[in-house]
């Protein structure tokens, strides 16, 4: 039975030598990031490496063709999914929120649904009382005019919906040193990584120059309530919306149908 690898490891970010082993041990490589297939040149030449679309576009069907009035519309807050990062980042987000009169939506990870109010208070602190709670990220982002987001895939999620954002991230110093030693990317937000790749045509060299970005990133000491509010006030809504549409066009479509088609074709040959 052929081996199909769907959602490839991030060899473009670190440990690129893994690509050769993956090529040798898998029959088909299904990438969800357009640029990452360049890491698998042999499989690409043999048409065994395919871009199948991004799974977020299977669930995100709506895009704001016109941005909401972000200074009066609700504002979404996504301070992460791990308790440790929430405890580092949410207090800073909450401090910035105090200066904003907008309705505030705190988006909680789905695995927190089983937690009672006391458990949530232990994680988020008393500041949680100033927020409306939502477990439906896509819905909350769609109705929000702006978002304060921790990092990672959530930045792409907001961008594909068309919600302007600022990324804020803070972690332990030792983790930063390790990341800088092994990961050479300029950005940490997936939306920025993808947008930079779109204009550099390389997954592991030019894309690291960081010359293109969709949203501001505030990392470590840069992450303050003052800087978050500054990013909020200075957002260029029109520019963001244009870039968000470009990124959506770059990713093209969801991946479910394409992967299912590949699997059906393989099974038909067995």
Predicted regions and their residues:
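Nucleotide-activated sugar donor-binding and catalytic core shared by glycosyltransferases
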Residues: 1-270
């Amino acid at each position: 039975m052929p081996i199909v690898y769907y959602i490839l490891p991030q060899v473009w970010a670190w440990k690129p030598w893994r690509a050769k082993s993956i090529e040798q041990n898998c029959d088909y490589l299904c990438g969800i990031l357009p640029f990452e297939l360049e890491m698998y040149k042999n499989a690409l030449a043999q048409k065994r490496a395919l871009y199948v679309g991004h799974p977020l576009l299977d669930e995100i069907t709506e895009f704001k063709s016109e941005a909401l009035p972000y200074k009066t519309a609700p504002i979404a807050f996504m301070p992460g999914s791990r308790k440790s990062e929430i405890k580092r980042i949410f207090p800073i987000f909450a401090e910035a929120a105090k200066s904003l009169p907008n309705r505030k939506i705190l988006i909680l990870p789905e695995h927190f649904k089983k937690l009672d109010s006391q458990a949530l208070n232990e994680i988020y602190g008393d500041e949680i009382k100033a927020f409306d709670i939502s477990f439906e990220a896509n819905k909350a982002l769609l109705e929000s005019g702006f978002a304060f987001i921790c990092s990672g895939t959530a930045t792409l999620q907001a961008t594909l919906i068309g919600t302007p954002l600022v990324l804020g991230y803070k972690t332990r110093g030792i983790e930063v040193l390790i990341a800088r030693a092994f990961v050479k990317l300029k950005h940490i937000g997936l939306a920025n990584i993808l947008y930079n790749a779109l204009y550099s045509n390389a997954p592991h060299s030019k894309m690291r120059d960081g010359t293109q970005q969709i949203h501001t990133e505030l990392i470590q000491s840069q992450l303050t309530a003052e800087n978050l509010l500054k990013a909020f006030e200075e957002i260029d809504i029109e520019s963001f919306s244009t870039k968000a549409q470009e990124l959506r066009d770059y990713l093209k479509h969801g991946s479910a149908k394409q992967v299912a088609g590949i699997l059906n074709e393989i099974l038909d040959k067995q």
